[in-house]
A protein has these predicted regions:
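Short, solvent-exposed loop/turn and secondary-structure capping segments
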Residues: 23-29, 66-68, 73-77, 132, ...
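The canonical Cys-X-X-Cys-His
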Residues: 52, 58-67, 175-179
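Electrostatic cytochrome c docking/interface patches
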Residues: 33-57, 69-77, 91, 189
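Secretory-pathway/luminal and periplasmic proteins that interact with or process carbohydrate-rich
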Residues: 63, 142-143, 185-187
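Electron-transfer interface patches adjacent to heme c in soluble/periplasmic c-type cytochromes
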Residues: 11-20, 77-172, 182
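Post-cleavage N-terminal segment of exported redox proteins
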Residues: 1-47, 177-189
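Active-site micro-motifs of SAM-dependent methyltransferase domains
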Residues: 63, 71, 106
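Sparse recognition of residues in long alpha-helices and their boundaries
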Residues: 61, 68-69, 80, 120
Length: 189
């Protein structure tokens, strides 16, 4: 067989090589990944936490925050190293793209206060003066006379309109519920 003149053979070999590589690089690993079982004790998100996850995706939070702890000493403050089962119930898994902000894998344990999270969502510099995270004030409203059912967010003076009370909207609560749900399951070795 002369490959210099037999173009059908060249195209056939290229297609065969492409298909073979596709099977070994993409298809077989994907089939193996589908067999991954959830980490024992892992619960699927529901209710406000699930809706908050959708808002997290919509706002692009994964651009600056990761949800993946590397098994390295430098990542020890964020929790144990992540394993495949930690993401078995997520679609898509939210690993993040870069760690401009802190890793959120275990933020539900590290920062469990609803009020702190709401203040941070409204204006991050109100609780972390060096934060470069943008605020999300559109998830809040201002009222002169809040209702008893309103969730009041104690924003410091100068960071909110004068004579106004900051009230968390449903979406703000949903995002915070999602963040509070981010807790690693302990794994027995």
């Amino acid at each position: 067989m002369n490959l210099h003149t037999n173009h059908k053979a060249i195209i056939g070999m290229a297609a065969g090589l492409f298909l073979t590589l596709s099977l070994f690089i993409a298809v077989f690993p994907a089939l193996e990944a589908e067999k991954t079982l959830p980490t024992p004790g892992l619960q699927a998100l529901s209710g406000d936490a699930l809706l908050g996850r959708e808002l997290y995706l919509k706002e692009g939070c994964g651009v600056c925050h990761t949800q993946f702890v590397r098994d390295l000493p430098v990542d020890a403050p964020w929790g144990r190293g992540s394993i495949a089962g930690d993401y078995a119930l997520e679609d898509p898994p939210l690993l993040g793209t870069q760690r401009t902000g802190p890793d959120l894998t275990n933020v539900g344990l590290r920062q469990s206060s609803e009020i702190w999270n709401l203040i941070h969502l409204y204006n991050p510099r109100a609780v972390v003066t060096t934060s470069i995270m943008p605020g999300y004030p559109w998830y809040f409203e201002f009222k002169s006379n809040p209702q008893p059912s309103d969730i009041i967010v104690p924003i410091p003076d100068g960071m909110k309109p004068p004579q106004q009370t900051v009230i968390a909207r449903t979406e703000a609560i949903q995002i915070v519920r999602y963040l509070q749900s981010l807790r690693q399951i302990e794994v027995l070795e």
